[in-house]
Structures are given as structure tokens and as C-alpha cells.
Amino acid sequence: MVEVICATSFLIHLATRKIKNIDSVDTEIGQIQFVVPSAVLNELKKLSKTQKKKQDAITALEFARNLKTTEMSGKFADQAIIERVRKRGGMIATIDNELKNKIKSLGGSVMSFSNDKIVLES
């Protein structure tokens, strides 16, 4: 089973939108497990206190209760994820272009969305 580490942006999108191919992702790329870093949970808790992102953050936090979590500390979630990829490689799920490029430059794999479908980027 491949663990896919979720960035904040991806988790919010996953929790708040209807994803067209969510049930077939396992058959397309093998069995996956979404994993939520503690740094992402902390970021979502902060966002849940802001007016602009409050509802999306709360929805994502509720959604994350059903996912595996992993300890990954850092001042910022993206930085914690980058450090993890730098040390161990892995697959990261994000919709943030800057984070995508950094992960790819470190040799990591990227999962994202296109037209509300989960896709692997090369």
C-alpha cells in the first residue's frame, strides 16, 4: 500500500468537493492510503479560526478524522512535507503549484486534481 501525504490544499479540496474517480483511484495506481501530517492538522485548526476559510477548514478537519495521521512537525505544513520528501522520498498530494515543483525537484511523486478527478503528475 502506498501512503500519500496530503497537503492542506489537497485535503480541503478532497473534503469539500465531489471527486469523480475517488472509488477507482486504487485500481488505477494501486492501493493507496491518504495520510495527514500533524502540521497540516495544525494549519487547518488555525484556518478554522479565520472568517474566509473557516467552514472549509472545519469540513477538512472532520474528514481527516477518518484518515491515518503522522507526526510531522514544522512551523509550516509545506516545509514539514518538503523535509519529509528530502529525507525519505514519497508521494505528496497537493494542488499548490510551488509545492508540486519543489517535490518533483526532490524526486518525489505528486498527486493532484484535474477537473475534480485525482491524477498523478509526472
Where are these regions (language model features)?
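Nuclease catalytic cores that cleave nucleic-acid phosphodiester bonds
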Residues: 39-122
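Domain-level signal for Mg2+-assisted phosphodiester chemistry and nucleotide/NA-binding surfaces
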Residues: 1-66
